[in-house]
Amino acid sequence: MGRTLAVPTPYGCIGCKLPQPDYPPALIVFMFCAMVITIVVDLIGNSMVILAVSKNKKLRNSGNVFVVSLSVADMLVAIYPYPLMLHAMAIGGWDLSKLQCQMVGFITGLSVVGSIFNIMAIAINRYCYICHSLQYERIFSVRNTCIYLAVTWIMTVLAVLPNMYIGTIEYDPRTYTCIFNYVNNPAFAVTIVCIHFVLPLLIVGFCYVKIWTKVLAARDPAGQNPDNQLAEVRNFLTMFVIFLLFAVCWCPINALTVLVAVNPKEMAGKIPNWVYLAAYFIAYFNSCLNAVIYGVLNENFRREYWTIFHAMRHPVLFLSGLLTDVREMQEAQAHTHARARARTQAHEQDHAHACPAVEEIPMSVRNVPLPGHGAAGQPECVSGHPKPASGHSRSVSARRKSASAHPKSASGQSKSATVYPKPTSVHFKPSSVYFKADSVYFKPSSSHPKPITGPSKTAISPATSFPKPTTGYTQHATIHSEPTTLDYLEPITTSHSKPVIASHSELAASCHLECNIFDLSDPTSSPASDSSNSAASLLDPTAAAAATVNPTVVTTDYHEIVLIDVDADSDEMAV
């Protein structure tokens, strides 16, 4: 592995090999020991912070997520850059590759910028917790906290990456480490200091001033417990001291960077080398102080520290405790997921009860237009009858017993009696379908309706229940309809009056009546004759009532009415 080449500059010797540094040997030994202690305390202390937060349920909150993130940022420099610094101090120079020097500078930048950004996130979290307590749970929910943490580290990486291209990372013999050389680009150096140090400090200072003002305004010495006041003050002081120590430790090195960047020719030779060394080592020492501050000022952290110390004396118990904690965390997560699933199912059931599912319409009654819908584009009456002036008609019912579930048509083929009940019945409009009281009558001996031939109205005999043709005369004494169940009664018409079918479409009468009507047209009569005969019957109802029924008239035109009595307990049939 070759040595790094020397790069002399007018403002100092950066990258030069110094076999005999101008520091006293005692100072080098002291700094070497201080760095060893810093590395040990950094690794152990920040590891204990992470374990304490993971083991203590009281410490598992959104604010301590950024505390753990700050501990990770502090541990970065103790893992890689600090050991290489010890190596450079031991041999008096840098004998490693250029890539390793670049890695040292990049990881150091991540640690420093990550620390200040996490301290800023902690201050914002404390500010929202104290000054905006009502919105705290919504702002710092578990999901939002993870997003904020990811944004913090993304900002850290984006803030350090420009230094890899603009600022040159080189070995500095004054600090025994690889740093960013901003001497050749003073404007960039000032910008970096403002973004990485000054702006975060202003934000953190604003948050803690607001917090302190809120705490002082909320104090009530007469009605508040002094122990609670002391606990609030200690919780506030813990994070404030963390911020204050970071500002004190990193202020000297940032001030030197700005001074050298503003006036490099004059300031480069006036600043002694030991000032650079002291400034950098104070900044490096800050990485191990946070864990100590937590243990001194926070009772929960201090209690967990003692628990970890006692557990480390018995490694087997310590490992078993860790496994138990991991298992408890998994069980807690499984319980949380189960509760979430149960809550989701409860919401779905409530929604299902609130919005019941609509039953599917059976195939036998699908595509059947409801009354009033199919007549939108066609005339309502095809027989020439005037539209009744009354409102919705009620269904006319006749008492009959069902002897067969499958009535047969004239061709001998049985009709399907399968009926799919629906939660609600269909109510017909008076303009859709209505049968006249004098056109249908029944005989109680049989329940098998048969098609009726003839150009006149359909009549069902009470003796046989077989439809018989009528020749324009209705037998008034055989009418079994109940006029009290109708909203209106039409006069008795002549032989050419027909049931009114809206729009020539099929008719489905709820789930108790299925009517298949064929051959609506009458080849033996014309609409003109229908209209005239209907008018005559309307003018002379007594003549039609006195007429006799001629059962011998046979015609080729018929209307088929299939009656299905589904409900055995019902004594009525809707007409």
UniProtKB/Swiss-Prot annotation:
> Region Disordered: what ranges?
368-421, 446-474
Establish whether keyword Membrane is in the entry: yes
Which GO terms fall under molecular function for this chain's record? melatonin receptor activity
The residue ranges flagged as biased composition, category Polar residues, are 455-474
Record key words, sorted: Cell membrane, Disulfide bond, G-protein coupled receptor, Membrane, Receptor, Transducer, Transmembrane, Transmembrane helix
Chief location of this protein within or outside the cell: membrane
Q: How does it assemble?
A: Homodimer, and heterodimer with MTNR1A and MTNR1B. Interacts with KAT5. Interacts with RTN4 isoform A/NOGO-A. Interacts with TGFBR1.
What biological function has been recorded for the protein in this entry? Answer: G protein-coupled receptor that plays a role in numerous physiological processes including regulation of energy metabolism, neurite outgrowth or cell migration. Promotes self-renewal and neuronal differentiation of neural progenitor cells through activation of the NOTCH and WNT/beta-catenin signaling pathways. Modulates the KAT5-dependent glucocorticoid receptor signaling by modulating KAT5 subcellular compartmentalisation.
The protein's name is Melatonin-related receptor
Ranked from the top, the taxonomy reads: Eukaryota, Metazoa, Chordata, Craniata, Vertebrata
